[in-house]
């Protein structure tokens, strides 16, 4: 049970190395002219970096650059604007931070000069992650650095900004707030703007904020860098208004390559709804010495399963959007620093975060589309030699999702779990939920939110709520019969209407 058996391969393995695409096309926002090449170096010591930066990189244990670093850092050091496309876990954080820090160093920035570099990123956790890397890289530099994110103390942030923060890492909403309202925030000397995970920033609704931010920030002689895992029309529009004409387009996600890391073993298991929790419980119980992330589709489902597993002495951490920022931050770093453990979370942790040495990614609730799948599994097998495994739970009615994954170049195997290895604790689970008022309420909330999330899936041909066996779904939440709940069902996951569907006892 600790390692599922590999039944059969769904796709071929990748055999090609990532390449750089630097040709000029209108689709790529007038990228560098054909024939222009970046300097190909492999070691950090081959770059003309300052001693404080080289000393920090050595202390961090890095010697050889990843593909995206080798392709991106030289042109950025030369002052070029860059539009970058790279796999998650490719090392792009160092790729943009090193040139930014070198720029501050060469200009001898001091606190009184204000903010010279701004890094914009979609989520608080990713901002904290980048801030942590920046802190290590700037250990031997005199320049100042800081972070502004939603949920943190705004007044304390404003005080630091007024004292002078040379490099600022920020989420879009809080950055716009400070740009508009914090007197004494000096950003007139801005020299570089970095937009990380641009597609995700736009996906979660920050398009208007980004346009306002770019309009406010000075653009004279400003270097800009935009990184995005996918190149959508909206990303191209954002690149057009934020980058100078003729940016260098660097692509290390070629069409012939698999969309996920080479060191990642990926599989799925076909499981009826009423057996899902039993299988998950059995798997986690037998892999307590591993480091595991379990993805669920809603905050309430995370809260329920975390409460349940902790109650029955299977210790887990939880991370979701309804937690206060300090709790999210503490949980994130606790799991990062742990050698083993289980983190149950929503997709808040699925993008960009670099959590060390994750052994397994479990997609207990299925992702909305292949891009979400790729970002989830990107939490393991990170770096050039990273290894990891992933397992996705699918019901028999959801197998159509495999076609979408195959079209997105995701190699997948089917795993089988012997039934005699699955713990049959259903009756004990139902007794517990019936007798414990708090768990009963959180189970009901989790059940309702699961159905709500299912109804909001964008792939309606795969995830059809009218084909869900509600009695079996209810059993996975510890109910012998479905509880009565209200859910909102819309024609699209983006704009559900007010039609109600009731599920009865």
Swiss-Prot record:
It catalyses: ATP + H2O = ADP + phosphate + H(+). Residues 263-433 form the Helicase C-terminal domain. Optimum pH is 6.5. Active from pH 5 to 8. ATP binds at residues 86-93. Residues 1-37 are annotated as: Disordered. Changing residue 105 to Y: Decreases the amount of 40S ribosomal subunits at 37 degrees Celsius. Residues 73-249 form the Helicase ATP-binding domain. The Q motif is unique to and characteristic of the DEAD box family of RNA helicases and controls ATP binding and hydrolysis. Interacts with RRP1. Associates in the nucleolus with the 60S and pre-60S ribosomal subunits. It has also been isolated with the nuclear pore complex. Transcription depends partially on SET1. This is ATP-dependent RNA helicase HAS1. It comes from Saccharomyces cerevisiae (strain ATCC 204508 / S288c) (Baker's yeast).
């Amino acid at each position: 049970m600790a390692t599922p058996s590999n039944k059969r391969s769904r796709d071929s393995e990748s055999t090609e190395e990532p390449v750089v695409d630097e040709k000029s096309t209108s689709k790529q926002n007038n990228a560098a002219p054909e024939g222009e090449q970046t300097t190909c170096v492999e070691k950090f010591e081959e770059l003309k970096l300052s001693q404080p930066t080289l000393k920090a990189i050595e202390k961090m244990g890095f010697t050889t650059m990843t593909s995206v670093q080798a392709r991106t850092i030289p042109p950025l050091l030369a002052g070029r604007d860059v539009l970058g496309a790279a796999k998650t876990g490719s090392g792009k954080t160092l790729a943009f931070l090193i040139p930014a820090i070198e720029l501050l160093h060469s200009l001898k920035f001091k606190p009184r000069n204000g903010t010279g570099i701004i890094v914009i990123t979609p989520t608080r956790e990713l901002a904290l992650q980048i801030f942590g890397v920046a802190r290590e890289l700037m250990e031997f530099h005199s320049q100042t650095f800081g972070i502004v994110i939603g949920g943190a103390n705004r007044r304390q942030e404003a005080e630091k900004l007024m004292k002078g923060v040379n490099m600022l890492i920020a989420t879009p909403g809080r950055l716009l707030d400070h740009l508009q309202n914090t007197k004494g925030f000096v950003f007139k000397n801005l020299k570089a703007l970095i937009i990380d995970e641009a597609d995700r920033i736009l996906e979660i609704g920050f398009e208007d904020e980004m346009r306002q931010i770019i309009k406010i920030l000075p653009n004279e002689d400003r270097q800009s860098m935009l990184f995005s895992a996918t190149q959508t029309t909206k990303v191209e529009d954002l690149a057009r208004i934020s980058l100078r004409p003729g940016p260098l387009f660097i692509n290390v996600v070629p069409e012939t390559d698999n969309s996920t890391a080479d060191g990642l073993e990926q599989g799925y298991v076909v499981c009826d709804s009423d057996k899902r929790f039993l299988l998950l419980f059995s798997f986690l119980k037998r892999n307590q010495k591993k480091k595991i992330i379990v993805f669920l589709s809603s905050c309430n489902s995370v809260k329920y399963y975390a409460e349940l597993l902790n109650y029955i002495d299977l210790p887990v951490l939880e991370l979701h959007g309804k937690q206060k920022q300090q709790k999210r931050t503490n949980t994130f770093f606790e799991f990062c620093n742990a050698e083993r453990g289980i983190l149950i979370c929503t997709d808040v942790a699925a993008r960009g975060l670099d959590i060390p040495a994750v052994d397994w990614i479990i997609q207990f609730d299925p992702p909305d589309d292949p891009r979400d799948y790729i970002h989830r599994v990107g939490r393991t097998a990170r770096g050039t030699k990273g290894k990891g495994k992933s397992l996705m739970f699918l019901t028999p009615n959801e197998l159509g999702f495999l076609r979408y994954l195959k079209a997105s170049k995701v190699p997948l195997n089917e795993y089988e779990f012997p039934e005699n290895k699955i713990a049959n604790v259903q009756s004990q689970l139902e007794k517990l939920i019936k007798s414990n008022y708090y768990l009963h309420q959180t189970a009901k909330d989790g059940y309702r939110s699961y159905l709500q999330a299912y109804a909001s899936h964008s792939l309606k041909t795969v995830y059809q709520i009218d084909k869900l066996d509600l009695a079996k779904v209810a059993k996975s939440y510890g109910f012998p019969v479905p509880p009565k709940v209200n859910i909102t069902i819309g024609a699209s996951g983006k704009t559900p209407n007010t039609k109600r569907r009731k599920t009865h006892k």
